[in-house]
Amino acid sequence: MEYKKIEINYQLCQLEELSEVEQMVVKKSIEATNTAYAKYSHFYVGAAALLNNGIVVMGSNQENAAFPSSLCAERTAVFAAQATYPNEPIKVLAIAAKTDKGILKDPITPCGACRQVLLEVEGRYSQPIKILLYGQNGIYCLTSVKDLLPFSFVESNMQD
């Protein structure tokens, strides 16, 4: 038996260490938490996608009594961006979350389904998406979705 190891590299940043544009995208993700419909979980997630053309598309989680019918903030933002601007790659995606007590201290990461969707989008445009995961204690900065999903399932897996 052979043991192998996978490491994920990311930076822990403070808001003021980001570029002005990245700070704006993070602030938009925080703003997007206010549009979440989280009647059941009271967990409000916001996402903001900066497109190559400079437009920011925001999304938030939208819950449903039938939980599998709910949508996460990341997919809401990404699908809205792709439906509205199908030829524009996403350059940066920021994610923030809060409860009824306020913005979380530590960042949250996308669920598995969102990671898979983000990976597909990254591959579609052959351009990495910088991921900024916001928490009051700091921001996890990742250079690519691949950093969130080291064992990924992509189109090439379905070919001989």
Model-derived features with residue positions:
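Short, compositionally biased leader-like segments
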Residues: 1-27, 101-103
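Short Pro/Gly-enriched beta-strand edge/turn motifs at strand-loop
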Residues: 27-34
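Short loop/turn motifs at secondary-structure junctions and domain boundaries
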Residues: 38-41
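Short beta-strand scaffold segments in enzyme catalytic cores
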Residues: 44-51
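Zn2+-dependent cytidine deaminase-like catalytic core
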Residues: 58-158
